[in-house]
């Protein structure tokens, strides 16, 4: 089913509720480029064998909401660009996602410029080694809590908050940046004032050059820079 509906520009709705996907391993790009798609009735994903979901909704620019409650992602190792370019999505509920096997998560939400709410508290990032551009150009997000994100295996986390021009609160208190001496996670468009929660002074020293006017907090202890 890879690329099955890719670039079907005129599609506005799809009902796939009767599709049997139990034996599928990949669904890459299945809806990618369906610019006018506003409604998708997805098949039941609870018993699938999927290992890749790359670009599945990429550039579905007209989607406002998605029901992902039936997604079984327990075997998925890659979900790169899964929602990239979904510029009309306002919120996403990923509470049913099991990401314990995911290694590649780069560009997952890139260009989701209308997202105002994103609960990632259930995501398991223990095996993720690439988070590049994860929230790039999510310009409507004002706060983001990644306190549950484990980054001990993460070797690349570049540009994670690039273009997040309205962020004023970030919690990355679980981030260690073990493999990076000077991580580039912010750009010049980051707001001039905000609060960021980090693990310790070592992490602060690695990232503070790009957000020199922000207030840093170590866990529950605040310190101004």
Q: Each PLM stretch: what is its role?
A:
Residues 9-25, 35-51, 62-77, 88-103, ...:
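Structural signature of tandem-repeat unit edges
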Residues 191-225:
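Extracellular/surface-exposed low-complexity segments
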Residues 1-10:
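Low-complexity/repetitive intrinsically disordered segments
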Residues 2-3, 25-29, 54-55, 77-81, ...:
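Register-specific detector for alpha-helical tandem repeat solenoids, activating on a conserved position
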Residues 187-188:
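Long, ordered, amphipathic alpha-helical scaffolds
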Residues 6, 32-33, 58-59, 84-85, ...:
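Predominantly recognizes leucine-rich repeat
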Residues 22, 31, 41, 57, ...:
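Residues marking helix boundaries in flexible regions
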């Amino acid at each position: 089913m890879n690329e099955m509906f890719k670039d079907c520009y005129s599609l506005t709705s799809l009902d796939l509720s009767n599709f049997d996907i139990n034996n599928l391993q990949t669904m890459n790009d299945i809806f990618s480029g369906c610019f006018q798609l506003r409604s998708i009735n997805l098949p039941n994903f609870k018993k699938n064998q999927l290992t890749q979901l790359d670009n599945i909704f990429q550039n579905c620019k007209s989607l406002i909401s998605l029901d992902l409650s039936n997604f079984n992602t327990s075997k998925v190792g890659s979900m790169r660009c899964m929602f990239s370019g979904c510029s009309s999505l306002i919120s996403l509920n990923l509470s049913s996602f099991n990401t314990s096997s995911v290694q590649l998560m780069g560009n997952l939400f890139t260009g989701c410029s209308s997202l105002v709410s994103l609960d990632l508290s259930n995501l398991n990032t223990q095996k993720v080694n690439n988070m590049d551009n994860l929230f790039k150009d999510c310009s409507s997000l004002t706060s983001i809590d990644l306190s549950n994100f484990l980054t001990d295996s993460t070797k690349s986390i570049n540009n994670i908050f690039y273009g997040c021009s309205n962020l004023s609160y970030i919690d990355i208190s679980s981030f260690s940046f073990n493999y990076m001496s000077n991580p580039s996670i912010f750009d010049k468009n980051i707001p001039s004032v905000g609060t960021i929660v980090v693990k310790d002074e070592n992490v602060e020293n690695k990232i503070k050059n790009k957000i020199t006017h922000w207030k840093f907090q170590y866990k529950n202890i605040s310190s101004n820079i």
